[in-house]
Amino acid sequence: MLKYFISLLVLISFSAQAKEELFIYNWSDYIAEDTIENFENEFGIDVTYDVFDSNEVLEAKLLAGGSGYDIVVPSGSFLENQIKAGVFQKLDKSKLSNIGNLDPDVLAKIEAHDPGGQYSINYMYGTTGIGYNTDKVDENDITSWSILFDPAIASKYEDCGIAMLDAPTEVMEIALKYVGKDPYTEDEKDYEVALAMLQEIRPYIRYFDSSQYIDDLANGEICLTMGWSGDVFLAADEAADGVEAWYSIPSEGTVIWFDMMAIPADAKNVENAHKFINYILRPQVAADITNYVWYSNPNKAANELVDPEIFEDPAIYPDEATLSMLFADTADSPKKAQLSTKYFNKFKSN
């Protein structure tokens, strides 16, 4: 009996050791419905998939250490400083056989975030713009940030509901550009000018959130939001009967950003992390995600597999004219990060 019991313990111990796992921390509403399940079935790896809705939340976990995740997806502007802080380990590109599918033009745009792509692979990219209900919002208003930042215009939409991203860096950069200041400024007086403008429109904002607006726009609970391109298009795709939503890039310009897959330095399942990244780099997998979340992927080999309605829309896959209206999301200096958070919080609490 004792011999049987010992054998059973050994078997249980071996089974526990043999269990293949992977822990992923990604943005909410940012993957196709079957991506994880398909990966698990093919590789026999159990995936724990958690979500966040702000770079600040992710960064706090990473800098504290011991996050428990094997793959995380920070925006490139945050990734830059996280690399400097030693948060990530270098990728083993010998394990990424599909890396050649990446578009050289996209790689050039993200070079500043991670020179040579030593630590990260671009997952998806997009822009920050205006999400709106086509029946409740005047189409003449959606071409400019004035729809959110001019109180005379924003007040028209107070009753049908305005939401704002809970994203200090992006909101403050866009607000600074709107008032004619450098979006990358470290001059506190410039932030005071932007705050004065934001305080004028604060009474008309129903809430600040970086994911709730998707369902609310789709269900008609709000009619206007600052939002991320794919999230707004997802709301449009899932809109309830009688609700139509769409996305606009304002004429004053906006941020283009790139979200990056990276492996934390203390990740426990590094081999499986590389398997997942390489899986995402398959053309069909990348296209399936884009077709579901409506965000651009960097996989050139996937272009022909992306729904033409998505691939041919310059608000999703920017053409040269659209690119000329965009400015890069860059890494914050400690001072800029502090100013962005300080003045954004003043805006929220006003």
Regions found by a protein language model. Name each.
Residues 78-81, 224-243:
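A ligand-binding cleft/hinge motif common to bilobed small-molecule-binding domains
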Residues 73, 79, 83-204, 211-218:
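Extracytoplasmic ligand-binding site segments that recognize negatively charged/polar headgroups
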Residues 70-74, 206-207, 223-228:
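Paired acidic/hydrophobic, glycine-rich loop segments that form the ligand-binding mouth/hinge
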